[in-house]
Amino acid sequence: MKFLIFAFFGGVHLLSLCSGKAICKNGISKRTFEEIKEEIASCGDVAKAIINLAVYGKAQNRSYERLALLVDTVGPRLSGSKNLEKAIQIMYQNLQQDGLEKVHLEPVRIPHWERGEESAVMLEPRIHKIAILGLGSSIGTPPEGITAEVLVVTSFDELQRRASEARGKIVVYNQPYINYSRTVQYRTQGAVEAAKVGALASLIRSVASFSIYSPHTGIQEYQDGVPKIPTACITVEDAEMMSRMASHGIKIVIQLKMGAKTYPDTDSFNTVAEITGSKYPEQVVLVSGHLDSWDVGQGAMDDGGGAFISWEALSLIKDLGLRPKRTLRLVLWTAEEQGGVGAFQYYQLHKVNISNYSLVMESDAGTFLPTGLQFTGSEKARAIMEEVMSLLQPLNITQVLSHGEGTDINFWIQAGVPGASLLDDLYKYFFFHHSHGDTMTVMDPKQMNVAAAVWAVVSYVVADMEEMLPRS
């Protein structure tokens, strides 16, 4: 049956097949929820066509193959790097060749930091080369490096209790991994807290749920009025080893060398493409992922997958000849890893039209097998999204959970626009996150097919509804 559906929808231009009539007064909907449910249910055949094309049809594995071509040939795409700008230009050409509309680049200014050469060696109690990855925005060491005794702590509280021991030392954090959102504070704030008690540098246990001797990088933040000290992540294994040594009273000495340097901000671009709406072209449903990555691995998982299923969503809709009532806009963000820099500048440029944004969507937590969406919005909007997700019952992907926030869409969500993030299986995500292991080997083409289908169905149906999602 699915192949019959695909053959029918693949051969004609569907334009907008979901039915719906607005009954509004002073901008307030007078439709009952049952009427809205009927409108969404009328999109069932379109949803099946998208699923069949993405998962079983000629488009299967396309997002995976497109992604592999980019990351294998360009590699990692650090903010401020030539690789990132090369990738942006390639994507600009790709989106044009794909037949999408209003393809353009929106200029932004982004940070430019480079890690340079870096090394760490344990000198006492034995010689041991320590794998490190400097953290984004860290300063470097003097050319001769920093050689100092180590103080190992497991928390900020312990650091405060032992503050008198920290001066002139390298602080090593061996904090337990609870979850990413709770543990990442040691990466972002570890240098500042160590500097406050007089440390010369900080080394932080990688924020990872599993390790095969692999350090994980990421952004860190300095604080005005606090001395800047070099900071890097080390492996889980080395952090635990030094913690065991310290518990036995063994003196540890490390020599740390880091060539990290921050350069003036540089030019970059957010990459934009659309399928212009047939009835309300000024209104927008936004789908997105970020094109930049860290400078290790390939940035395939974070966030090549999210960027490419967002492109694939528009490709699927275009291939089926669909044109929703309002505009579907793809944005591939730049400099997300530095704190959503490109996304903030996009918001500043476009917030004048905030009343026309129905839904902002971001995929930046992997493209493993999805189970649904995370959503932030009014109760009425959530109820509507639950009906939209029911169209994905053929894939058994219907969950709508809370917390749809994402770094690049938070600006809109905080201003009241409904937001959604892809909900998928994160079991392996932090094995590879911000590490040399983030390569195409992590990616699964079949899982990407399903993720793209979810992304396309949700974005299309919301864009084709007669009315925008209700806000709080």
Curated annotation (Swiss-Prot):
Q: Does the keyword Endoplasmic reticulum apply?
A: yes
* Protein name, as recorded: Carboxypeptidase Q
Q: May I ask which residue range the UniProt record assigns to the signal sequence?
A: 1-20
InterPro entries with a match to the protein in the record: CPQ, Peptidase_M28
Glycosylation: residue positions: 61, 179, 353, 356, 396
Q: Which organism is it from?
A: Homo sapiens (Human)
Gene Ontology molecular function: carboxypeptidase activity; metal ion binding; metallodipeptidase activity; protein homodimerization activity
Which keywords are on file for this protein?
Answer: Carboxypeptidase, Endoplasmic reticulum, Glycoprotein, Golgi apparatus, Hydrolase, Lysosome, Metal-binding, Metalloprotease, Protease, Secreted, Signal, Zinc, Zymogen
Enzyme active site: 336
Q: How does it assemble?
A: Homodimer. The monomeric form is inactive while the homodimer is active.
